[in-house]
From Swiss-Prot:
Belongs to the GcvP family. N-terminal subunit subfamily. The glycine cleavage system is composed of four proteins: P, T, L and H. In this organism, the P 'protein' is a heterodimer of two subunits. Signal peptide: none annotated. GO terms for biological process: glycine decarboxylation via glycine cleavage system; nucleoside metabolic process. HAMAP family: GcvPA (MF_00712). The gene is gcvPA. Its EC number is 1.4.4.2. InterPro entries: GcvPA (IPR023010), GDC-P_N (IPR049315), GDC_P (IPR020581), PyrdxlP-dep_Trfase (IPR015424), PyrdxlP-dep_Trfase_major (IPR015421), PyrdxlP-dep_Trfase_small (IPR015422). It catalyses: N(6)-[(R)-lipoyl]-L-lysyl-[glycine-cleavage complex H protein] + glycine + H(+) = N(6)-[(R)-S(8)-aminomethyldihydrolipoyl]-L-lysyl-[glycine-cleavage complex H protein] + CO2. GO terms for molecular function: glycine dehydrogenase (decarboxylating) activity. This is Probable glycine dehydrogenase (decarboxylating) subunit 1.
Length: 448
């Protein structure tokens, strides 16, 4: 352009037309018949000033039920958690905000170290040996775990509990279809995976057993009992886990999990319409070379200084193309950084306290709802979500709650016909006693 800081000028247009040998812009469209060419002005609104545009967009945004204006008891994979103020401050730094895959370590040490710290934190939470730099979200991380299991065992059958998040299971089925894998769903009993049904399906053709911890109903799966069933047949044991729950629960790695995946949304990532999120993927050492996605390793340079580099890159698509272990590329480095900053701000003690608050407040809510005559079909231990039985359609109850400034729980009947009229309630550390009591009063006030 002739003028560096000005948009397209008439001089620019004439210079471009002259360069390509065309007299006018109309000549560029000469191959379009005259009778079908548009003439006149497009019916679009005139341009707005910046203040006018802000007002219009704000009015549109106010039509949404935001957790900033409403009290949310909705979870089902996306939760309203505390985000330390420092998270947005660090994310807004230009070297992180616009960074891409750090192929050149000599100019990317900051980003590489941030990713390395993320990997380290994931390993500490899950009790695993190696974690990658992130996945797109929990669902795609689980699907990649299934593909890894099939490739490693050279088997085609996948056993997955119906107590795993319905959308996670749908993503797994989508990935499995292209690989011609058989996905067999194991029913739940009492809110957790039916161990007898699982044992009956186990065979030498099973690539992996997949459960969620805590599961979709918030219940704590008995990993200690499930792992031997998988390993007895030399199948891999895959666990999808809420990382916040691992602040108080025994990590899956301690029970013998081969692959642990999940979604880092509880740490530093807002609800934001359900995405983008940040999946995590961790494995035991024998599977290290088959893990999908980027891996950052720590090394020393020729002067003995500590440095960070992308390692084991022969697994990746920019090296091996069609032979790569995964086609995930840019991953979710910025959201992984958000999770890392949030975890760093909280510290180990803070994560434990945050998880404990979720447990305490969720159990308080359940006890109070039971006092009002509501009941749960499941009696096992749970984390920060639980199921309650309503006497009316959940959609009707949620519409009424919304009028009262409350976002109600998830309608389980949408995915589990046998649980029609049941609500999945999530209670996080942000919910106050007054908010929980108001929710209980609204549900107990003729909604049960």
């Amino acid at each position: 352009m002739l003028h560096r800081y000005l948009p397209m000028t008439e001089e620019d247009k004439q210079e471009m037309l002259k360069t390509i040998g065309v007299a006018s812009i109309d000549d560029l469209f000469a191959d379009i018949p005259e009778q079908v060419r548009f003439r006149g002005e497009l019916k679009v609104k005139p341009a707005k000033s910046e203040p006018e545009l802000w007002k219009e967009l704000a009015a549109l945004a106010e039509k949404n039920a935001s957790v900033k204006q409403y009290v949310s008891f909705l979870g089902a994979g996306v939760y309203d958690h505390y985000i330390p103020a420092v998270v947005d401050h660090v994310l807004s730094r230009s070297e992180f905000y616009t960074a891409y895959t750090p192929y050149q370590p000599e100019i990317s040490q900051g980003e590489l170290q941030a990713i390395f710290e993320f990997q380290t934190m994931v390993c500490e939470l899950t009790g695993m040996d190696v974690a990658n730099s992130s996945m797109y979200d929990g669902g795609t991380a689980l699907a990649e775990a299934v593909l890894l299991s099939a490739a490693h065992t050279k088997r085609k059958k996948v056993l997955i509990s119906t107590a795993v998040h319905p959308q996670y299971r749908e993503v797994v089925r989508t990935y499995a279809k292209g690989q011609k894998l058989e996905v067999k769903e194991i029913p739940y009993d009492g809110g957790i995976t039916d161990l007898k049904a699982l044992e009956a399906e186990m065979g030498d053709d099973v690539a992996c057993v997949v459960v969620q911890y805590p599961n979709f109903f918030g219940q704590i799966e008995p990993l200690k009992a499930i792992a031997p069933l998988a390993h007895e047949k030399k199948s891999l044991f895959v666990v999808a886990s809420n990382p916040l729950a691992l602040g108080v629960l025994t990590p899956p790695g301690a029970f013998g999990a081969d692959i642990v995946v999940g979604d880092m949304q509880p740490f530093g990532i807002p609800t934001q319409f359900g995405g983008p999120h940040c999946g995590y993927f961790a494995v035991k050492a024998p599977l290290m070379r088959k893990i999908p996605g980027r891996l950052v390793g720590q090394t020393t340079d020729e002067d003995g200084r500590r440095g960070f580099v992308l390692t084991l890159q022969a697994r990746e698509q920019h090296i091996r193309r069609d032979k790569a272990t995964s086609n995930i590329c840019s991953n979710q480095a910025l959201n992984a950084l958000a999770a890392s900053v949030a975890l760093s701000a909280l510290g180990k003690r803070g994560v434990k306290e945050m998880a404990a608050m979720n447990i305490q407040k969720a159990h308080y809510a359940k006890v109070e709802l039971e006092k009002r005559g509501l009941s749960s079909p499941f009696a096992g231990p749970f984390f920060n979500e639980f199921v309650i039985r309503l006497g009316r359609p959940v959609s009707d109850v949620n519409d009424r709650l919304l009028e009262k400034g409350i976002i109600g729980g998830y309608d389980l009947g949408a995915d589990y016909p046998e649980l029609a009229g049941h609500m999945l309630v999530a209670v996080t550390e942000l919910r106050t006693k007054e908010e929980i009591d108001r929710f209980v009063n609204e549900l107990g006030d003729g909604h049960a």
